[in-house]
Amino acid sequence: MAPKAEKKPASKAPAEKKPAAKKTATSGTKKRSKTRKETYSSYIYKVLKQTHPDTGISQKAMSIMNSFVNDIFERIAGEASKLAAYNKKSTISAREIQTAVRLILPGELAKHAVSEGTRAVTKYSSAAN
């Protein structure tokens, strides 16, 4: 039987950090790109310019609007999902979305949202043909 090599106990001192080598674009290594954050900012800005062409929006206000759109989207999607489950359907259709909007948004706001949504779906359907 061959003798076993002795193992040195691990030193408790952290390993010395070497300065990172500078990488250039010509070295062939890919630079890590930033992860893309999806927001509704461009769409919010377009709607703002349609309604108030001479008005701007701050970054903080845009962030608030983006959070608002995400919140409403999640509420409607959640309610539509429940409605589909109640009716034993695995697909959320325009009908579930419309009913969810009526349940979530109050009074006149729901009526306007439903009419605008119907108009958008009609426009999309006619463009698809």
Swiss-Prot record:
Pfam families in UniProt: Histone
Covalent cross-link site, Glycyl lysine isopeptide (Lys-Gly) (interchain with G-Cter in ubiquitin): K123
Subcellular location as annotated: Nucleus; Chromosome
GO cellular component terms, A-Z: nucleosome; nucleus
SUPFAM superfamilies xrefs: Histone-fold (SSF47113)
InterPro entries with a match to the protein in the record: Histone-fold, Histone_H2A/H2B/H3, Histone_H2B, HISTONE_H2B_site
Main location: nucleus
Alphabetized UniProt keyword annotations: Acetylation, Chromosome, DNA-binding, Isopeptide bond, Nucleosome core, Nucleus, Phosphoprotein, Ubl conjugation
Positions bearing the Glycyl lysine isopeptide (Lys-Gly) (interchain with G-Cter in SUMO) cross-link: K7, K8, K17, K18
Task performed by this protein: Core component of nucleosome. Nucleosomes wrap and compact DNA into chromatin, limiting DNA accessibility to the cellular machineries which require DNA as a template. Histones thereby play a central role in transcription regulation, DNA repair, DNA replication and chromosomal stability. DNA accessibility is regulated via a complex set of post-translational modifications of histones, also called histone code, and nucleosome remodeling.
Name the record gives this protein: Histone H2B.2
Organism this protein belongs to: Debaryomyces hansenii (strain ATCC 36239 / CBS 767 / BCRC 21394 / JCM 1990 / NBRC 0083 / IGC 2968)
Gene: HTB2
